[in-house]
Each structure stands twice: as structure tokens, then as C-alpha cells.
């Protein structure tokens, strides 16, 4: 009985162990199945087709030690274009600290307090300072201050600042050879007189600050001296206070807005000139005043489009409408290129150089009107055409300087130079009158004791 009972008990225990083993095997296999599925899925993602559209498994990327980025709400839609432009203009003026534009109902613009009795006060100053004469050697020519400049900010175009540097170097070369003082300005002295008009407050300031300067010579930054030997016939203008390049018939008969050009002009340091600046300036404040005068000039001057007032049109308007007041003291020069238009000049430099100076008609100043060297684009001409023309003008002028030292550009289209004269051990200007004049001008010679 016991054996039977014992055998039954033994068989029951074995059955229980089998059932327990089956239950344990099933529960232990479940995690293994999950692991296998994950491994297969991972292998599928790595090795399987990437372009399948029937099966997509989200990719999970765990990144450690990186900042947490919090999603933000989408920005509001932009305002209408007109509102954006108004906001941009307002913001620009606030950022730069400019005053609001002068309105037509505001008092007329003024350069400052009216200066009276200037000629007498200047004469007294010159008498008290004989070490700063208004006339200098050679031949007692007038003391001249050449004035130029550019905007205070860097150029938007990376090449622009380089072009301005070369243009200034050109002016320094000419002034050094001819004994002229030079002033380079990079500040807007009056926020209302921007753009073309910035020269007016500058000229007034320099006149009263430098009574020793008999003449102020304004030269635009994009005007290049291209005849480094040419000397202005100073005595021709002894009784005139303003010298402009242009044509009298175009100004007084045709009333053309391009009858003269203000890119390069001479103005005498005297009361008459201060009065002219005072009459000239009220047409230049930025904003509605400048726009209104631009419309007036378009009506009164032939060929002028109705854009905002520029200083050149304003001066011509004064000369035409107030000729009795200003005309007698204005000399309009056309016998040489005090302000030559670049487009008809820059491709003829080689021809001019081959012909030499027999006719004495090399272009004195080449002015790149319509080109803006500081901008990425030009006003009226392709930017590349302007850049190429300026490069040729710089090199044509620079060759006249390099020649003094025995070098020249390989061509006017490159900055590369070559030696054109062997050194002999003698002074470079020995036996060469032209070189002697440039290297050792008479105004630099010590006076005999």
C-alpha cells in the first residue's frame, strides 16, 4: 500500500515539476522574444531599404550633455509692406539719432548765424599772422586748401573702401607735387544736409577756421586727377570768387541742369562766398523741403527729372534766377577739364599717352559721374564698367608718379608694375626738366638767406 501510495505521490510530484517547468519556461521566453524583435527591427533600420513607404519606424536619438531646446510659439505674421517701410524708416532715424525731417511749414534752414564783416576781420587776422600768408610761392599764387571726403560708415561693397583709398592717394599725390594743402572729411557736420549737400556746412566751417586759405577747392571722392603736371591758371580767376567747369550758354541760355558741374570747383574765402552758401543751403534739407525743390528745379531747368533737389541744380537755379547778384563773380571754365566726364575719357588714355603733351590737352580731372564706388551698384552705368574705368584712371595718374622713380604699370588694366629706367647713380632728375619739376618743385626750395 505504502509503495503504491508512495509511487503515486512520486508521480504527482514529477508531474508538478513538469508543469512548473513549463510555466517557468514560458514566462522566461517572453523577454527574449521582445529582445529578438528589437534586434531584428534595429537590423532592419540599418540594413533594410530606406525608401520604403510601407514600413516606418520612428528614429530615436539620445544626445547627452546638450542644452534643452524649448519649442516656442510661431512668430506673428509680418505687417503690410507700407507699415514695414514706415517702421524701418522710423527705427533707422531713432537709431542714428537724426532729427525729424524739416517740414515745408517750418522756418527755412540756415547754416548758422549770419556772418557779417568777414572780409575786414579776415584781413585783420592775416595782418596779425604774417607767418600764414594768403599767397605763397611760386609766383605768389593763392594759398589753396583742397577738400574732399566720404561717408563716415564703411562701404557696403568690400571693394568700395579700397577705391576710396586709391582716390584719396591720387589727390594727395597731386597736392604734394603742387604744394596744396588737403583736408579729408568723414563726418556729417549737419544731419539735415546729407548726400550731395554735406559739402556746404563743411566749406563754411573751413573758411572761417582757415582764414589763411585764399581758395577752397572742393573735389568729389569719385573725381580723379589724371594730369599730374597741370597747374591751374590761378591769375585768370583773380577777380572771380567761384570757378566752375561748364558752359555759359548752357546755363544762361538753355537753363540746363547740367550746364555746370559741382564735382570739382574753386570758391574764394570771402564774404561773397559765405553769402552764396547762405542762399544756397535752404534748398538742401532732407525730407519734404528737398523733395519740393526737386519738383521746382524740374519745372525751371531744362532736361531735369523730378527727383529730390541736388546741390548742382540748386546752384544753377540761383545763377539763372539771380544772375545780377552772383553772375559777375562766377567764372565758368571750359578751356580745360576742371571736371571731365569719365565715359568719353577712360578708353583713350593709351592714345593720349602716345601722343604726348604737345597739344597740352590731357584730361585734368576725370569725374566718374553716375558711378558710386562705395556701393554694390552704380546709379546709371554697369558697376563693372565703372570699376574698370576707375582702375584705368588711377593707373594712368599713378604712372606719372611712378615714372619719377623709374617704374610704370604693365598696362592700365592691372596693378602690376615694371622697371622702365635703369638707375645710373646720378640724381633721378639729372637732365630731365619735367622730372625735376615734379621731384623738386620750386615751392619746396629753401629761400636764400
UniProtKB/Swiss-Prot annotation:
Catalytic activity, EC: 2.4.-.-
Coiled coil residues, start to end: none
Localization (cell): Golgi apparatus membrane
TM region positions: 29-49
PANTHER family: GLYCOSYLTRANSFERASE 5-RELATED, XYLOGLUCAN 6-XYLOSYLTRANSFERASE 5-RELATED-RELATED
Family statement drawn from the similarity comment of this UniProt entry: Belongs to the glycosyltransferase 34 family.
Keyword annotations from UniProtKB, A to Z: Glycoprotein, Glycosyltransferase, Golgi apparatus, Membrane, Signal-anchor, Transferase, Transmembrane, Transmembrane helix
Pfam families: Glyco_transf_34
Region (Disordered): 1-24, 74-109
Membrane topology: Single-pass type II membrane protein
Induction: Down-regulated by treatment with atrazine.
GO CC term (a single one): Golgi membrane
Lumenal compartment spans: 50-449
Glycosylation sites: 89, 413, 422
Gene that this sequence comes from: GT5
Role of this protein: Probable glycosyltransferase that may be involved in the biosynthesis of xyloglucan.
Name of the protein this chain belongs to: Probable glycosyltransferase 5
MF (Gene Ontology): hexosyltransferase activity; UDP-xylosyltransferase activity; xyloglucan 6-xylosyltransferase activity
Amino acid at each position: 500500500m505504502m509503495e503504491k501510495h508512495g509511487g503515486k505521490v512520486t508521480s504527482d510530484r514529477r508531474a508538478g515539476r513538469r508543469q512548473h517547468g513549463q510555466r517557468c519556461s514560458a514566462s522566461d521566453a517572453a523577454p527574449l522574444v521582445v529582445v529578438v524583435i528589437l534586434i531584428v527591427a534595429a537590423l532592419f533600420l540599418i540594413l533594410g531599404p530606406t525608401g520604403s513607404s510601407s514600413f516606418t519606424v520612428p528614429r530615436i536619438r539620445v544626445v547627452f550633455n546638450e542644452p534643452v531646446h524649448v519649442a516656442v510659439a510661431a512668430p506673428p505674421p509680418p505687417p503690410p509692406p507700407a507699415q514695414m517701410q514706415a517702421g524701418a524708416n522710423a527705427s533707422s532715424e531713432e537709431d542714428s539719432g537724426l532729427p525729424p525731417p524739416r517740414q515745408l511749414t517750418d522756418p527755412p534752414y540756415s547754416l548758422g548765424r549770419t556772418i557779417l564783416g568777414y572780409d575786414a576781420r579776415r584781413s585783420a587776422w592775416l595782418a596779425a599772422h604774417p607767418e600764414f600768408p594768403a599767397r605763397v610761392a611760386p609766383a605768389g599764387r593763392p594759398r589753396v586748401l583742397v577738400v574732399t571726403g566720404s561717408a563716415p560708415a564703411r562701404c557696403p561693397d568690400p571693394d568700395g573702401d579700397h577705391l576710396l583709398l586709391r582716390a584719396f592717394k591720387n589727390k594727395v599725390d597731386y597736392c604734394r607735387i603742387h604744394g596744396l594743402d588737403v583736408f579729408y572729411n568723414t563726418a556729417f557736420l549737419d544731419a539735415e544736409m546729407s548726400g550731395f549737400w554735406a559739402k556746404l556746412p563743411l566749406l563754411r566751417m573751413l573758411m572761417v577756421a582757415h582764414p589763411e586759405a585764399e581758395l577752397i577747392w572742393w573735389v568729389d571722392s569719385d573725381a580723379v586727377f589724371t594730369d599730374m603736371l597741370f597747374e591751374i591758371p590761378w591769375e585768370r580767376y583773380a577777380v572771380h570768387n567761384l570757378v566752375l567747369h561748364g558752359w555759359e550758354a548752357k546755363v544762361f541760355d538753355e537753363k540746363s541742369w547740367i550746364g555746370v558741374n559741382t564735382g570739382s570747383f574753386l570758391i574764394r574765402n570771402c564774404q561773397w562766398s559765405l553769402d552764396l552758401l547762405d542762399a544756397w543751403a535752404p534748398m538742401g534739407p532732407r525730407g519734404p523741403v528737398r523733395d519740393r525743390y526737386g519738383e521746382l528745379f524740374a519745372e525751371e531747368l531744362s532736361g531735369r527729372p523730378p527727383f529730390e533737389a541736388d546741390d548742382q541744380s540748386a546752384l544753377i537755379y540761383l545763377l539763372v534766377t539771380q544772375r545780377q547778384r552772383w553772375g559777375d563773380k562766377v567764372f565758368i571754365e571750359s578751356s580745360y577739364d576742371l571736371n571731365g566726364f569719365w565715359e568719353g575719357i577712360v578708353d583713350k588714355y593709351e592714345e593720349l599717352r602716345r601722343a604726348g603733351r604737345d597739344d597740352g590737352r590731357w584730361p585734368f580731372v576725370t569725374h566718374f559721374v553716375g558711378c558710386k564706388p562705395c556701393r554694390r551698384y552704380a546709379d546709371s552705368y554697369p558697376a563693372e564698367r565703372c570699376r574698370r574705368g576707375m582702375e584705368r584712371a588711377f593707373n594712368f595718374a599713378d604712372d606719372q608718379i611712378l615714372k619719377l622713380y623709374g617704374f610704370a604699370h604693365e598696362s592700365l588694366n592691372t596693378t602690376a608694375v615694371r622697371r622702365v629706367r635703369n638707375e645710373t647713380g646720378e640724381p633721378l632728375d639729372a637732365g630731365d626738366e619735367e622730372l625735376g619739376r615734379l621731384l623738386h618743385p620750386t615751392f619746396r626750395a629753401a629761400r636764400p638767406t
